[in-house]
Amino acid sequence: MIRKTFAALAVFLWLAVPAMADDSRQMVEMPAMMRDHMLANMRDHLRTLDQILAELAKGDAKSAADTAESRLGMSSLDAHGAEHMAPMMPPGMRDIGTSLHHAASRFAIAVHDAELEPPEQGARMVFAALREMTAACEACHAGYRLR
């Protein structure tokens, strides 16, 4: 039994350690309180994206636009504490974060503009704008990690 446990642990470490060592994302160090605040913001961003998708799935694009602007758009920055967080971020990370907030505001505009287009074209506009938001999230998580 001990041999099997040891063998399983050895295989796990053999597989896991290289994966951890290959993490080439830039480490961003900040005080624990700020890191926790940033992580909470990112979790809220994910909840917001989920809410936007739920509203779109219900056919309530106007609510999705309002949610995007009020919780992720440029008008939401004060609520996120962006002013005191930005100086702690490397410039590239800060730029990606700003692009997320701009993309959310553009999404809200795209939803309203889509109402003036044929349904299929309007849907493509909305999904393209939504993808800009998720692309910003993916770019940041692919390039940076917090400590």
Predicted regions and their residues:
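Positively charged n-region of N-terminal signal peptides that target proteins for export
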Residues: 1-4
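Sequence context surrounding c-type heme c attachment/ligation sites in exported
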Residues: 24-147
